[in-house]
Amino acid sequence: MQAHLSANDLACRRGERLLFSGLSLSLEAGDALHVTGPNGVGKTSLMRILAGLARPFTGSVECTGSIAMLDERLALDTDHTLRDALAFWERLDGACNAAQMRAALGLLSLLDIPVRYLSTGQRKRAGLARMAGQNADIWLLDEPLNGLDTDAQASVAGLIAAHRAQGGICVIASHQPTGLDIPQLALEPMR
């Protein structure tokens, strides 16, 4: 199966405020897209619409393949060790390459530490490992580089490149530069 993600003439409204309209995109296996724009312009709303977690005001989304999403809510139980918190999700998600993702993101030395003691960047890397371990065809990454140091950002870039090389699709929403040579979709505030 070839991954595919497209959106046709999307509009998003929050209350009486129109965040964006007329948004269309089409991504095939190996493609990536960087959605940019200032805070509050609708980047997260677009990601939630693409993931099927929110309905567009108008328009439609078509998807072939499985979707995994990373957002600001990492859903890691702070009362458990990182090992146990990740194991919980690995059982639910059916993660098949979780150990590989833990190693790739430098988490092996942190597995026995309670999540509440991890830094923001360490928690973000754990969330990325959880998401990548799902082996989904389409990755939706909402602000994936927030809180990451230069080495961790390079690790994430490597994971994204490997995912694309295997036919995966990646959509990154961020107001930060990604360091990746991929097309950009700039969302602008509606007037």
Outline where the language-model segments fall.
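Catalytic Walker B motif of ABC-type/P-loop ATPase nucleotide-binding domains
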Residues: 139-143
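Conserved ABC ATPase "signature" region
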Residues: 96-111
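Conserved ABC ATPase signature
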Residues: 114-123
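Conserved structural motif at the start of ABC-family nucleotide-binding domains
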Residues: 5-7, 19-22, 148
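Hydrophobic anchor residue at the start of the ABC signature
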Residues: 128, 167
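Helix-to-loop junction immediately C-terminal to a conserved catalytic motif
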Residues: 51
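Q-loop/switch helix immediately C-terminal to the Walker
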Residues: 73, 78-97
